[in-house]
Amino acid sequence: MQSRPKSTMSKSSIGKTARGFATLLLAAAVAVTGSVTAFAQAVPVVRDAEIEALVRDYARPIFKAAGLANDGVDIVLVNDQSFNAFVTGRRLFINTGALMQAETPNEIIGVIAHEAGHIAGGHQQKLRDQLERAKTMAIIATLLGAGAIVAGATTNSRGLAGAGMGVAAGGGEMAQRSILAYQRTEESTADRSAITYLNATGQSGLGMLKTFARFQSALSLSGTQVDPYRISHPMPQERIANLEVLVKQSPNVDKVDPPALQQRHDMMRIKIAAYMGGQAAATRLIRKAPGSLASRYGEAQMAYLYGNLGAALTKANALIKEQPKNPYFQEMRGDILMKANKPKDAADAYAKAVSLDPVRSGLLPVSLGQALMAIGTPDSLKKAVVQINNGLGRDKENTVGYRYLAQAYGELGNIPAAELATAEGHFYSGDYTNAKIFAMRAQKDLKRGEPGWIRAQDIINYNPSGKLKK
């Protein structure tokens, strides 16, 4: 809430008012105007090979329909229990809360389609342009108000001076409402684009309507009175009204998700509930379909998380017998065996997971490398380095992987490589200061011109703007 303005306004305070409003706009649009990398690093990210593969399967046909198939859009899972998704740059962030609350794949696919509409429509760049216009609007209003204040003071007119203060204060409000109105328009455009993509891929839009109905129900239950002109999204009921006819006229309106996809979705929900929602949340989902594959998967996860490793291993083995080609059952078996301090058996399970993985996730080789490190022999450490490097080659931003790689190199006595791996970990964490320190330390013992030396030099030359120093 803004305090009441004083009766006089200096040039300094005019500048502060204009700059303050500009800062407010920029803060509100941090995902649009800020550094994408820095913003992503501030988000509590969740990494899981199984969930990432499923969400990418949801997104692939939608991205193709939106013309984004070859644009390298990254999908990032956020550890947040609220139902939300958003885009920054070429990254689509989806909260684990949305994945757990959505009862069908179609609901999440609708969310992805909406966000794809923002990316394909270039809405972020357009919002940047709108922000610049809004800043100009606020500055002009502030200056006009200041002029009226000066005129009022010169003529000893309190009314004119008061009107001037109203203009100055109202300029920011006017610009803010302009931005919000623009954002609401873009949200509606993204909704319509989403329906287009869903139709193009032969999928129903009912999931989108269900999502908006969920928002409307939550709003009604909260009892909150919302000014529709002071929010960045249209009201849920308005969004339903705008889309309902389009959805119901579609020949795909009654299409349902394939049973195999629904099963993977159910397994994902229970997994998220077990890890992030706690025992009560997981138990609620397990009881909805007792005896199902998803419920038995959840029971195995719960046994593992709560230390009943014997039961967890028995349940995991039963799941593997039922689906021997499922890489994530083998991954879970490896997790259980690692917790049971059986790294050799865990390494065998992780190796099977890596060989079965159709999407070649970078996470699974790192898990295999971790198990090989735990074995602790020189031969297993060398194999660990190979596996972790394989994983990082597929997924360069896996900062945990660099920590394991540095440790493995250190135990093998390869200190320059350990320091370079540490530099890489800091670099992808956004800690450029320490990244440069370790890169310089690594360079001292690396041969000039070799790949490691060149990579260290790239890190040393890097600046947060994303450009190399000349």
Predicted regions and their residues:
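Extracytoplasmic and endomembrane cell-envelope/extracellular-matrix remodeling and assembly machinery
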Residues: 41, 47-49, 53, 75, ...
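Catalytic Zn2+-binding segment of zinc metalloproteases
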Residues: 116-133, 151
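Short coil turns that delineate tetratricopeptide repeat
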Residues: 290, 324, 358-360, 396, ...
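Canonical tetratricopeptide repeat
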Residues: 298, 332, 367-368, 404, ...
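Residue-level recognition of tetratricopeptide repeat
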Residues: 301, 335, 370-373, 407, ...
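Structural motif corresponding to the intra-repeat A-B loop/turn of tetratricopeptide repeats
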Residues: 306, 340, 375-378, 412-413, ...
